[in-house]
Each structure stands twice: as structure tokens, then as C-alpha cells.
């Protein structure tokens, strides 16, 4: 009886735990779409209502992929110092999402696309900077290896997608000079180019296992873009959509629609998968002489019932997108995928058996602990208390602190273990309960909240309303001015009321006066060449010319050649003459053997030319003489032949 009772108790506890842990409809696990914004991952349901957000600790998220077999999301952060690719596990009862580093950072990686193979548990990603495609196991047992190297040929791998059933990898080469869509076996063999014509810059790519087709984004020249499709071998190529003014990056495909992210509008858009234009379809022209119109076929008209639909407006730049497709449930009987799905399930079941409780005693203690302390709380028998994990409170850890805490925002537990709200754009307050536009704009004005939290919201006023809150009715104000002007012609009327007064005067000219502005043409077309402008212009030109003249003069003085050195040589020939009584040492010098040379240098510089040099003795002897002819003889330059 004791064993039977214990077994029944264990069974009841297990049933209770199963009921507590089984996800119900509308719980955070039941998400259908996930997108990567710049600083977080946002989860949405089938109606594109935000369920939760995660990965707030990252700064630059980009690519994302999803493993439906184990409910794991893999994403890339371009600014993380240690890791490059991470995994995120969402749990129904966990306060925070479990994030683990999967691929370490080795340099300045720039991940363009990310894909996952659940059979081999390998991640595949494209590196735009290194121009290579890598792969590595998620358990870190091996270093990343190169699957495709496009650096030598100048390729630029962007989007990547794995065909799990046929064991192939597809990627887009966004090199504008030679864009392609290619594929290769997952073992690195049999590389094939499947699309290389009529394509500009392919970006994101996805394999639709439900329809056995490829879908990719083509960023066309100018402002246009297209979403195209083909069979897995590149045949039967179709243009699903062609539009403009979008900057699409990545896409996801469901059973009946295509979804893509747009950086320009920060939105997610959708369009039916049914193609409307065939690339290879051409119409035969009608010849001028032909009378049979049966040979001419009009091109297929564009389906007007398939417009673009903006399904989500997001607060940040949106980049990657994944969708829950029910791949493993819907492809169990597919002849290409049945064996792969079976192998993946066997692997997942084998992993789950490792976490089963091995002993009955451990199982009993775990059941008692789960029965007393909920949400993984730690039970303390000595004090009969539950130590709750972060994010839960209550005597049994039964209250989730973030439950209904934020009115218009996402709740996350802060580092100090308190709930914190990340408000949606346009809301503020501790719990995001206050709208920044509440009662702000009057008279039908439209409030626009800035994306920058530091900027205040602004009002877009309708016609004939103004002011910071659209509180000023320009028609009523100008009507008062126009009526008063009828009685007080000298009153000032604002310039903006001129057109309103003219409209009112057409219906009621007896009580309305139109202001007459004497210098209206001056206000509308101001004269540029005024007297002050001309004076300033003339002074500037004259000053510029004077400055140029001073510079030229200084340069000429700086580079002016030096005055030449003047040398003059006097040659005195030897003459025989007798010594007279009046000879002195100055007049009767020793004679050279042949002749005597006298050199006078820089005569002009020494003012010799202006003041001639005289022989002192001869001057004394001839002081009494006044003849000019005699004075010339005593000059040095005239004494070459007369002194001896």
C-alpha cells in the first residue's frame, strides 16, 4: 500500500508539473515571427503583435536563423568583443532568456547571412569583409572552416540558405560587376552557378521547402527592387514583386506569403507568393502588314489584388527575419525530407534522455521542490522559505515581476533585480503608461513623436492653423485684423493675412478691408545690389590691389641684384729723370724695374668720384695757382704721364 500510494503521489505531482510547464496558447513560446533590430530581438505573433523582446545586452545585431528542432535562435552581433555568433533559448518559466556564445570572434568579421543545418548541427555564415563562407559546429568542437572562398574572383557573399533535405547550400553574390546566385553541396563539392543574368545586386535568400523553390531579393539600380523566385536548379524564374523606394535586406517565406525587412522605412512588409510577372515571357509584336490579330497576345496584367502590406512598424533599423513554418510536422511524408526529419528527431530524443532523473530519490526530491517552490525556486527546509530566481517573487515564487508591469513597452529585469520598462516610441513613464502626445495637439493637429528620446514631440498642424500645439487659428485672427482695418486704415496687419483678407473681401467687401503694403515688391524680391554692398565691394577690390602691389615691391627689393664692384687700375711707366731739389719721399719714390700698377677699388662707394683725390705735396706747391687747367693736372687720374 505504501508503494502504491507513493506511486500515485508521484504520478499526481508529475501531472501537475506537466500542466504547469505545458505552454498554452498566447504564451511567449507561441511566437510566429522574430526580427533582429539594432539592439534587440523582437518576437511577434501571427497578427504581428509584439510578444516579447530579448538580447538587449547587444549593440549591433544583424543576421538571424532559427532551429525549429530545439527552439534555438542563432544571431550575430558585429560589435561584441569576444563572440561573433550567439544562441538564444527562450523558456516559458525562465525570467531571462539564456544566451550562449557559439562562435568566437577572430577579427573584424562582417556577417552578411546566417544559416543552420539541424542534421550536422553546423552553422554556415557569409563574411562580407573576407569574401568567404564559413561553417562550424555549434558545440565548439572544431574551429571555423572555409566552405567557399570568393576573394580571388572578387565575389561578395551576402545571403545564405541551407537546403536541409537535399544537403545543399545556396548563397547570393552581390558583386555589382558580376552578381550571381550559386549553390554547393554541404561537403564542399559540386559548386554551380544557377543565376547569372538579368540580376543587379542579390541580397537575402531563402529555401522554401514546402514549394521546393528559391526566393531572393534583388536590389535593382536606382530606387527599384525586386523579389524573384525559381526552382532549386535556377529554372522557371519568376518575378514575384517589383517596386521602389525600399532597401530590403532579408526575407522569410510562409505557406502563402513573403515577408522582408526594409531599412528605409524601418518596417516589415508582406506580399503574396503568387507571382504576377514571368521574366522569360515576351509578347510577339504585330507586323505592319499583318491583318490577323490572333497571333498577338497581350502581356499578363499585373494582379491589382496583391498590394504591398506593411505588417509592422519598428522603432529601430530592422535587419534579419525568421518565421516558424512547422517544417518538421509538415514534411514527415515528403520523399526528399522524410529521412532527414526522422534522423533529426532521433538525435533530439537521444539528447533529451541525458537529462532524465536517474534515481528515484532524486526524482522525489525534485518533485517536492517543484511542488513547494515554483519557477525553479530554491527551497530551504531549515527556514521553510523559497529563494526565488531573478524576476519572480512571492512565498512560492509564483508571481512574475514583469507580468503586466509595462503598459506600452517591454519588461526586462535590470542588473539590480528590478523590473525595467523599455517603452515603445511615443510613450514614457516608469511603466510606459503616459503617452507623449496625450492632449498635445489641438484643432486636429497630428502629433509626431521623435525617434530620439531627447527631442520633444511636435505637432503637424492642418491648413490655417499654427503654433507649437496648433492652438492659433490664423483665419480667425486675420478676420479680426481685416475687420479692424476697415475702421482704422493705418493699423498694422500681419503680412500673412493678406491672402485671407482677399478671400473674405470677395464675400463681404463692406466689412472687410484688404491691407495694401507699400513696399510689397521689396519684401517679396529684395534688391541684392545695395549701396552698402557696392561700397564694401569697391573697398575690398582696392585693398586687394594695394596688397598685391606691396607684395610685388617687396619681392623686387628682395631679389634686386647687388651693385657691381668697381676696380680701376693705373699703370705708371718708368721714366728717367734727375733728382731735383724739390723731390720728397712722396714724389720721388723708388722706381720698379719696368712699371708700377695702382689699383683703386670701389671708388664710387668711397665717394672718391664725387671728391677727387689730390696729392698733398703738389697741392701745397700749387696753392697759389688759380688756373683750372693746372688743377686738372694734379688729379690722380690725370697724372699717368705727367708726374714723372
Curated annotation (Swiss-Prot):
Residues in compartment: Cytoplasmic: 553-644
Topological domain spans for side Extracellular: 27-531
Q: Where would I find the EGF-like domain in this sequence? A: 398-430, 433-471
At the top level, the lineage of the source is Eukaryota
Q: Which SMART domains match?
A: EGF, EGF_CA, LY
A single GO molecular-function term is: Wnt-protein binding
Cellular component terms, GO, for this chain's entry?
A: plasma membrane
InterPro entries under this entry?
Answer: 6-blade_b-propeller_TolB-like, Cueball_EGF_LRP_Nidogen, EGF-like_Ca-bd_dom, EGF-like_dom, LDLR_classB_rpt
Task: Give the subcellular location.
Answer: Cell membrane
UniProt xrefs under SUPFAM superfamilies: EGF/Laminin, YWTD domain
Q: Where are the transmembrane segments?
A: 532-552
**Keyword vocabulary terms for this entry:** Cell membrane, Differentiation, Disulfide bond, EGF-like domain, Glycoprotein, Membrane, Oogenesis, Repeat, Signal, Spermatogenesis, Transmembrane, Transmembrane helix
Instruction: Provide the GO biological process annotations.
Output: canonical Wnt signaling pathway; oogenesis; spermatogenesis
Listed Pfam families: Ldl_recept_b
Q: Residues of the signal sequence?
A: 1-26
- Carbohydrate attachment sites? 82, 108, 175, 190, 196, 313, 473, 508
Has the keyword DNA damage been applied to this entry?
A: no
- Give start and end residues of every LDL-receptor class B repeat: 121-166, 167-211, 212-257
Principal location listed in the UniProt entry: membrane
Q: Which cysteines are joined by disulfide bonds?
A: 402-411, 406-421, 437-447, 441-459, 461-470
CDD domains named in the record: EGF_CA
What PANTHER family does the annotation carry?
Answer: PROTEIN CUEBALL, VITELLOGENIN RECEPTOR-LIKE PROTEIN-RELATED-RELATED
Q: Name the family.
A: Belongs to the cueball family.
Role of this protein: Has a role in spermatogenesis and oogenesis.
User: What's the protein here called?
Assistant: Protein cueball
Q: Which organism is it from?
A: Drosophila erecta (Fruit fly)
What are the leading ranks of the lineage?
Eukaryota, Metazoa, Ecdysozoa, Arthropoda, Hexapoda
Amino acid at each position: 500500500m505504501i508503494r502504491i500510494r507513493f506511486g500515485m503521489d508521484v504520478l499526481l505531482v508529475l501531472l501537475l508539473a506537466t500542466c504547469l510547464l505545458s505552454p498554452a496558447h498566447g504564451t511567449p513560446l507561441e511566437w510566429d515571427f522574430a526580427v533582429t533590430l539594432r539592439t534587440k530581438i523582437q518576437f511577434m505573433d501571427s497578427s504581428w503583435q509584439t510578444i516579447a523582446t530579448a538580447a538587449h545586452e547587444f549593440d549591433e545585431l544583424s543576421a538571424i536563423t532559427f532551429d525549429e528542432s530545439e527552439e534555438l535562435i542563432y544571431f550575430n552581433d558585429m560589435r561584441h568583443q569576444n563572440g561573433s555568433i550567439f544562441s538564444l533559448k527562450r523558456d516559458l518559466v525562465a525570467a531571462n532568456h539564456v544566451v550562449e556564445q557559439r562562435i568566437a570572434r577572430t577579427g573584424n568579421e562582417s556577417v552578411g547571412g546566417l544559416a543552420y543545418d539541424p542534421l550536422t548541427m553546423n552553422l554556415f555564415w557569409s563574411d562580407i569583409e573576407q569574401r568567404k563562407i564559413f561553417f562550424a559546429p555549434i558545440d565548439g568542437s572544431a574551429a571555423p572552416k572555409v566552405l567557399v572562398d570568393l576573394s580571388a574572383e572578387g565575389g561578395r557573399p551576402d545571403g545564405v540558405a541551407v537546403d536541409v533535405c537535399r544537403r545543399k547550400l545556396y548563397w547570393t553574390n552581390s558583386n555589382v560587376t558580376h552578381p550571381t546566385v550559386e549553390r554547393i553541396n554541404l561537403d564542399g563539392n559540386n559548386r554551380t552557378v544557377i543565376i547569372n543574368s538579368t540580376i543587379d545586386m542579390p541580397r537575402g535568400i531563402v529555401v522554401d521547402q514546402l514549394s521546393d523553390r528559391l526566393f531572393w531579393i534583388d536590389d535593382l539600380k536606382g530606387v527599384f527592387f525586386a523579389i524573384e523566385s525559381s526552382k532549386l536548379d535556377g529554372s522557371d524564374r519568376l518575378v514575384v514583386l517589383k517596386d521602389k523606394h525600399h532597401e530590403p535586406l532579408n526575407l522569410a517565406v510562409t505557406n502563402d506569403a513573403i515577408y522582408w525587412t526594409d531599412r528605409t522605412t524601418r518596417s516589415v512588409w508582406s506580399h503574396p507568393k503568387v507571382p504576377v510577372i514571368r521574366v522569360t515571357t515576351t509578347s510577339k509584336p504585330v507586323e505592319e502588314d499583318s491583318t490577323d490579330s490572333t497571333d498577338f497576345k497581350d502581356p499578363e496584367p499585373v494582379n491589382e489584388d496583391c498590394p504591398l502590406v506593411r505588417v509592422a512598424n519598428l522603432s529601430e533599423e530592422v535587419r534579419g527575419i525568421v518565421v516558424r513554418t512547422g517544417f518538421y510536422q509538415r514534411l514527415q511524408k515528403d520523399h526528399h525530407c522524410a529521412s532527414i526529419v526522422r534522423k533529426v528527431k532521433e538525435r533530439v530524443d537521444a539528447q533529451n534522455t541525458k537529462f532524465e532523473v536517474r534515481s528515484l530519490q532524486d526524482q522525489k526530491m525534485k518533485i517536492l521542490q517543484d511542488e513547494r517552490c515554483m519557477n525553479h525556486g530554491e527551497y530551504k527546509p531549515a527556514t521553510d522559505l523559497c529563494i526565488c530566481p531573478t524576476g519572480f517573487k512571492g512565498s512560492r515564487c509564483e508571481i512574475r515581476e514583469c507580468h503586466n508591469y509595462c503598459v506600452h513597452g517591454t519588461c526586462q529585469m535590470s542588473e539590480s533585480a528590478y523590473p525595467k520598462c523599455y517603452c515603445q516610441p511615443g510613450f514614457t513613464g516608469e511603466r510606459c503608461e503616459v503617452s507623449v502626445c496625450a492632449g498635445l495637439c489641438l484643432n486636429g493637429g497630428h502629433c509626431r513623436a521623435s525617434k530620439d528620446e531627447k527631442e520633444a514631440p511636435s505637432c503637424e498642424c492642418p491648413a490655417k492653423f499654427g503654433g507649437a500645439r496648433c492652438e492659433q487659428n490664423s483665419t480667425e485672427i486675420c478676420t479680426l485684423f481685416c475687420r479692424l482695418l476697415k475702421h482704422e486704415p493705418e493699423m498694422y496687419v500681419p503680412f500673412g493675412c493678406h491672402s485671407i483678407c482677399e478671400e473674405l473681401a470677395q464675400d463681404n467687401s463692406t466689412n472687410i478691408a484688404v491691407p495694401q503694403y507699400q513696399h510689397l515688391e521689396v519684401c517679396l524680391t529684395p534688391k541684392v545690389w545695395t549701396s552698402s554692398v557696392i561700397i564694401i565691394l569697391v573697398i575690398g577690390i582696392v585693398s586687394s590691389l594695394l596688397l598685391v602691389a606691396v607684395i610685388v615691391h617687396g619681392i623686387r627689393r628682395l631679389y634686386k641684384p647687388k651693385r657691381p664692384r668697381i676696380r680701376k687700375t693705373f699703370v705708371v711707366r718708368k721714366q728717367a729723370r734727375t733728382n731735383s731739389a724739390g723731390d720728397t719721399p712722396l714724389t720721388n719714390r723708388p722706381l720698379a724695374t719696368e712699371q708700377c700698377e695702382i689699383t683703386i677699388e670701389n671708388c664710387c662707394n668711397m665717394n672718391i668720384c664725387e671728391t677727387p683725390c689730390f696729392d698733398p705735396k703738389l697741392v701745397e706747391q700749387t696753392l697759389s695757382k688759380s688756373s683750372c687747367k693746372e688743377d686738372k693736372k694734379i688729379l690722380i687720374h690725370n697724372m699717368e704721364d705727367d708726374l714723372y
